[in-house]
Amino acid sequence: MATPHINAVEGAFAETMLFPGDPLRAKYIAETFLENVEQVTDVRNMLGFTGTYKGKRISVMGSGMGIPSCSIYATELIRDYGVKNLIRVGTCGAISTDVKVRDVIIGMGACTDSAVNRLRFKGQDFAAIANYELMNAVIESAKVRGTKVRVGNIFSADLFYTPDPQMFDVMEKMGVLGVEMEAAGLYGVAHEFGARALCVVTVSDHIRTGEKTSAEERQTTFNDMIIMTLEAAITL
C-alpha cells in the first residue's frame, strides 16, 4: 500500500512513532535504542524503521526539514498507515533568556509565520497545540528520570535564515521558548486527521546569546531526551 512518499507495506508502522527531522537520526535512534529493528521505508532516502522498546512496538522515521515536508509524511503516516501518536524529537534555538542550552522544551503550543494552518482552517487562526495525554506522559517520564523540562510555546519558522531578526524581540516578549521548523504543521495535521502529536526538542544553540553546544554535548542531551520520550511512549 505504498504512498507517493512511503513504500512501507500495510501494518509496517507501530501506532506510536518518534519523528526526527533527519533520516540518519531516525536510523541512529532505531539502531541505538530499539530491538528487533526492521527498515520499512526508504523513498527519497527518508528512512523509516520499526522495532521494540522494552517489548512495545515503536516506529521511528525522518520528517525532513520544514512544515511542508513534515506535513506530507505526517499526513501519509496517519491517513494511510494508521499511526496514532507522532512525537517530533529534535533540536531548537532558544529565544528566552530564561532558557539555557541543553534544556529540554516541550512544545505545548506552536506559533508560526506559515499560512498552512489557515489554509486548512478556512482562513482563520488555528491554535496549534500538542495533545495533552502525550504531553503529560513525557512530563511524567521526565519527573521519574529527574530531567527538568520547560513547557510552553515554541515558534515554527518557515525561514531558517530570517531577514527580520527583530522578530526575536517580539517572540521573547510573548514568552516563546524556542524556534524550530516543524511543530505547527505537525500539530495541524494531527488535528485534521484525529491523531495525537507532540514536539520535544533540546536547545542546541541560543539565538540571543550566541552560545552553542558542542557535538558531544548535543549527542548526550539528545540521547537523554530520546530515552525520556521512549519511556513515555511505552505507557501510551
From Swiss-Prot:
Pfam family of the protein (one): PNP_UDP_1
Listed PANTHER family: PURINE NUCLEOSIDE PHOSPHORYLASE DEOD-TYPE, URIDINE PHOSPHORYLASE
Xref: HAMAP family: Pur_nucleosid_phosp
Active-site annotation: 205
Subunit description: Homohexamer; trimer of homodimers.
Annotated function: Catalyzes the reversible phosphorolytic breakdown of the N-glycosidic bond in the beta-(deoxy)ribonucleoside molecules, with the formation of the corresponding free purine bases and pentose-1-phosphate.
Residues the entry annotates as binding phosphate: 21, 25, 44, 88-91
Organism, scientific name: Shewanella baltica (strain OS155 / ATCC BAA-1091)
Entry's family note: Belongs to the PNP/UDP phosphorylase family.
Gene Ontology molecular function: purine-nucleoside phosphorylase activity
Domain of life: Bacteria
Protein name per its UniProtKB record: Purine nucleoside phosphorylase DeoD-type
